[in-house]
Amino acid sequence: GGNITVQIGDEGILLVDTQYAPLSDKILAAIRAISPKPIYYIVDTHHHGDHTGGNANLRAAGTTVSGGNMAGAIRDSGIGAAIIAHENVLLRLSSDKTPQALPSGGWPTSTFFGSKKELFFNGEGIEIIHLPAAHTDGDSIVFFRRSDVISAGDVFVTTSYPFIDTASGGSYQGYVAALEKLDDIIIPVYGQDGGTLVIPGHGRISNLGDVLNYRE
């Protein structure tokens, strides 16, 4: 499955992606070994099952948000963590024409249409940035501003050459533009020796040099 990013702070826990459903118990156990805080948010970087398969399980293990620390209203999502994603992720996960569609319990409960959604959680500004027609038509990267960390989803991986899912709206031009957007955000000297840390969809934690090499 894909990498999962976990943000833990005084307010609670935010996850980026959820891997496959059969791994949910192990994932939750690993999180609980670090913190007993409630899971309030899950962010889907795109709709593929190795990143969203655990949505329903980890949502059910979470806690419903109360209060207004997110820009944009949350749909009536029942009990559990809020699942945030671009609208195209919801459209694909809820479509009977999508091979990797999920039951409704795994669908995003809060979606956005534009280029970005902003969240303030655990004392940190978080930007969820849509990258149109890249790996798919629903890709987002998640930028943790204070931590100087980007969770990149499958627009950047270290384990293979780029895969463009054209059947799901991906394109070569969009993929290149997504990598250029990553380059624009990454700061090579701030915070740590390698600058902004980039968590790929698959593979090891990386930095600007790795992203530039991948783009070439």
Language model segments and positions:
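Second-shell loop/turn segments in exported
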Residues: I13-Y20, P162-S168, I205, D210-L212
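Histidine-centered catalytic micro-motifs
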Residues: V43-D50, L131-V142, I199-G203
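Conserved beta-strand hairpin/beta-sheet module of binuclear metal-dependent hydrolase folds
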Residues: G1-A30, S140-F144, V149-D154
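Residue-level marker for buried hydrophobic side chains located in beta-strands
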Residues: L14-V16, V43, I83, V149-S151, ...
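Divalent-metal (often Zn2+) His-rich catalytic cores of metallo-beta-lactamase-fold enzymes
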Residues: V149, Q173-E216
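Metallo-beta-lactamase
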Residues: A73-L131, T136-D137, R145-R146, A178-I186, ...
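Active-site metal-binding loops of divalent metal-dependent hydrolases
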Residues: T18-Q19, H47, N88, D154-V155, ...
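Active-site metal-binding motif and surrounding structural segment of the metallo-beta-lactamase
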Residues: G9-L14, A21-A81
